[in-house]
Design a protein with these regions (language model features):
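Interfacial segments of multi-pass membrane proteins
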Residues: 32-46, 172, 181-196
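Juxtamembrane transmembrane-helix boundary motif
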Residues: 1-17, 38, 44, 68-168, ...
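Conserved glycine-rich helix-kink/hinge and helix-boundary motifs of the Major Facilitator Superfamily
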Residues: 49, 77, 198-199, 258
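Generic transmembrane alpha-helix signature in multi-pass membrane proteins
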Residues: 60-71, 170-171, 182-187, 208-222
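Transmembrane alpha-helix interface/packing and boundary motifs in multi-pass membrane proteins
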Residues: 14-25, 62, 164-174
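Juxtamembrane transmembrane-helix termini in multi-pass membrane transport proteins
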Residues: 24-82
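Short hydrophobic/aromatic, small-residue-rich stretches within specific transmembrane helices
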Residues: 51-55, 201-205, 226-227, 231
Length: 277
């Protein structure tokens, strides 16, 4: 395979990754890492390094549009980033010394969890009574629905903050942004409307990934030949996805995505058990 062919295939694959990451709030890494390791046989640590950069690109591309539309809760995102950033650095340091096959198995398990999370019932309603802590931290906000701003309130701030720390560790360890856990924390525990939790997750993923990427960069796990087409493809896909989100019902997409991700996850787990990484 020539360098040009490799670059074009990688660009197309990561374009799809960015598109799906933007539409589902999971980040492009859930597709980028299996693509690099299973198809191109790239060392999983280099794949994680590229995926972290891809997550930054996905977050940047999608988050810009969502912030302009007033959907993203920026104050909440920056508050929760305290937990995820600390967790991300810890996870990245663990990944440096953990066997690659073990990382692959954990990655597969988290992918299956992510697939299940995409199919769960989403919270589309704004909570009327929030917690005093959310009020004190000024985390309650509004989001646009049919041209009107709908207020919503948050609950279980401590539980959501704690789960964000776990999401940060997995992000640093696996390079996938841990969007599913972030959405679970905001949508499931804190009772934020799903569209707000998805867009805020996209906003946060880039900051979390940047913290992890520093560790991988210092250890030499960033290859420009891999990273450049990955960043370009994911960024283009993320921008496209942010425009499509307003015009489509993503339920069918989530179902197809969940099935595909589950198959990829099983392959990752199998290869990890067979010591093929």
């Amino acid at each position: 395979m020539t360098i040009l062919t490799f670059t074009l295939i990688l660009f197309l694959g990561t374009f799809i990754a960015g598109l799906l990451g933007s539409l589902t709030g999971l980040g492009g890494g859930v597709v980028v890492i299996p693509l690099l390791t299973l198809l191109f046989h790239v060392d999983i640590r280099y794949a994680i390094g590229a995926a972290l950069l891809a997550s930054i690109a996905t977050s940047s591309g999608a988050a810009t549009a969502y912030v302009k539309e007033g959907i993203t809760n920026i104050r909440l995102g920056m508050f929760l980033e305290i937990a995820t950033t600390i967790g991300a650095v810890v996870g990245a340091l663990i990944a440096i010394y953990m066997p690659t096959n073990t990382i692959a198995i954990i990655f597969g398990v988290v992918l299956i969890f992510s697939a299940v999370m995409t199919l769960r019932k989403k919270n589309e309603h704004a909570l009327e009574g929030g917690s005093p802590l959310a009020e004190k931290l000024k985390l309650n906000s509004t989001y646009p629905v049919d041209g009107q701003k709908v207020p919503y309130k948050l609950t279980n701030i401590v539980g959501g903050f704690s789960l964000m720390g776990v999401a940060g560790v997995l992000s640093g360890l696996l390079g996938i942004g841990s969007g599913s856990l972030k959405v679970l924390a905001m949508d499931g525990l804190m009772k934020i409307p799903f569209k707000v939790s998805t867009t805020t997750s996209n906003f946060m993923i880039g900051v979390t990934a940047a913290a992890s990427a520093v560790v991988y960069l210092q250890r030499g796990y960033m290859d420009p030949g891999i990273a450049f087409p990955v960043i370009l493809g994911v960024l283009c896909g993320a921008i496209t996805g942010s425009k499509l989100l307003k015009k489509m019902n993503p339920k069918t997409l989530r179902l197809i995505f969940a099935v595909a991700i589950t198959l990829v996850a099983l392959q990752m787990i199998y290869n990890g058990v067979q010591n093929k990484f």
